[in-house]
Amino acid sequence: MDLKNGSLVTEFILLGFFGRWELQIFFFVTFSLIYGATVMGNILIMVTVTCRSTLHSPLYFLLGNLSFLDMCLSTATTPKMIIDLLTDHKTISVWGCVTQMFFMHFFGGAEMTLLIIMAFDRYVAICKPLHYRTIMSHKLLKGFAILSWIIGFLHSISQIVLTMNLPFCGHNVINNIFCDLPLVIKLACIETYTLELFVIADSGLLSFTCFILLLVSYIVILVSVPKKSSHGLSKALSTLSAHIIVVTLFFGPCIFIYVWPFSSLASNKTLAVFYTVITPLLNPSIYTLRNKKMQEAIRKLRFQYVSSAQNF
């Protein structure tokens, strides 16, 4: 970061959560348990999808990728946040802050794109079942996965490069639980209106566009299902309602933070917790662990592991 007015910013101070020491301990235990469950749940899904041949299908390939992105997104911010709950001086180096922002937007952008791809997969599976295997080929799936990572990278690097060149004059307090672009940009000692508009157009537009596309895809699926069977409609409603809950919890805070004008509202820590801590935990349970085929695969994998351990 640039030197300005004789003051070189080498670290930022994160205010984190306010409250008594007992409340900090409560948050520490709660977020530690949530993060542990998030990591274990997503690893379980990835291992099961990889090891069980019955799950080698387009849907579970995408779910495995989603689990990996969820785990990475949570890991980008949650461990540091948990550690800070036990310290009075909550600081992060400038480059640590930049790294945190890069990976958060990288994995977040990739996950948003992947959710669109998963909605397309569900549309093909429900509305064009006879052509599902032909359309969702292995080559297309690999291309989709690579595309989601490319979009996530471009989305993140385009904003981080501009932020890294900002001069900071000494004010280095961030009223949040982790580093995020809107709050870091506001600390710069130059006019950042153009950059703020760019962040709104980039992060805000990506979040809002993906959210609208997902809702439209769900509506199209529901409109198409009744032509086939009432049982199919009931099953689709059950599946999509759960998906909509997770999508809303993930995209809602993102849209509010990045589409809303840069103000104190952007520092709402509760919103930040939702899409970096809560949603990565909900995705395994709602998208995958409620799936009967996945549950059966996990049981068989556990039985196989126990049998191998006993024989050993």
From Swiss-Prot:
Location in or out of the cell: Cell membrane
GO MF entries: G protein-coupled receptor activity; olfactory receptor activity
Cytoplasmic-side positions: 50-57, 121-139, 220-235, 290-312
Keywords: Cell membrane, Disulfide bond, G-protein coupled receptor, Glycoprotein, Membrane, Olfaction, Receptor, Sensory transduction, Transducer, Transmembrane, Transmembrane helix
Glycosylation sites (chain numbering): 5, 268
Extracellular compartment spans: 1-25, 80-100, 159-195, 259-269
Record-linked SUPFAM superfamilies: Family A G protein-coupled receptor-like
GO cellular component assignments: plasma membrane
Function: Odorant receptor.
PANTHER family from the UniProt entry: OLFACTORY RECEPTOR
Name of the protein this chain belongs to: Olfactory receptor 4L1
Species: Homo sapiens (Human)
